[in-house]
């Protein structure tokens, strides 16, 4: 049995990691198969080392093309070592970010072009797309203010970019959503977290195959 691939996307501070944790606490007992939780950049030993390079605030001279290629390199390793084997084993994979983030951050935010960054990532992933993507929708300024409150002085290199960059990234996400309307589910992330989690769980119960989830 082939597995299923779910990704979570959104601007910085949208609450993806927290929402994913809460969603799994509710839905995991109902899954008929094993599941895997992972993240990007990272998810494997090599990819996590590349993550450290990408997000280190000391690397403030990083060229946009270098950044895009490092993300793609980390993703290639992540896909081959972790994601593809899990899907082939019939597992449900839940990933905190995937290719869509590169299209928004590097394609739109860094002005490299969404089409060009997609081409790089098609090569890196053998054109692997999630079956379902949740976009946690929040205005960039609200997301960034959340980060400053929750972990002041711990912003990574991309989180430290100015609001104009993050606004471009947000616009990039909106473009990507229009490219893949059947795959994306947009959730208002300014709601209380229990409401966000409830909506995500409802969508999962409607969309996951009956071979994977009970009571859907």
Curated annotation (Swiss-Prot):
It catalyses: dTMP + ATP = dTDP + ADP. Its EC number is 2.7.4.9. Keywords: ATP-binding, Kinase, Nucleotide biosynthesis, Nucleotide-binding, Transferase. The keyword Transferase applies. InterPro entries: P-loop_NTPase, Thymidylate_kin-like_dom, Thymidylate_kinase. One of its GO terms (molecular function) is ATP binding. It is an enzyme of class 2 (transferase). SUPFAM superfamilies: P-loop containing nucleoside triphosphate hydrolases (SSF52540). GO terms for biological process: dTDP biosynthetic process; dTTP biosynthetic process; dUDP biosynthetic process. It comes from the Bacteria. Gene3D superfamilies: P-loop containing nucleotide triphosphate hydrolases (3.40.50.300). One of its GO terms (cellular component) is cytosol. Phosphorylation of dTMP to form dTDP in both de novo and salvage pathways of dTTP synthesis. Belongs to the thymidylate kinase family. This is Thymidylate kinase. It comes from Lactobacillus acidophilus (strain ATCC 700396 / NCK56 / N2 / NCFM). The lineage of its organism: Bacteria, Bacillati, Bacillota, Bacilli, Lactobacillales. The gene is tmk.
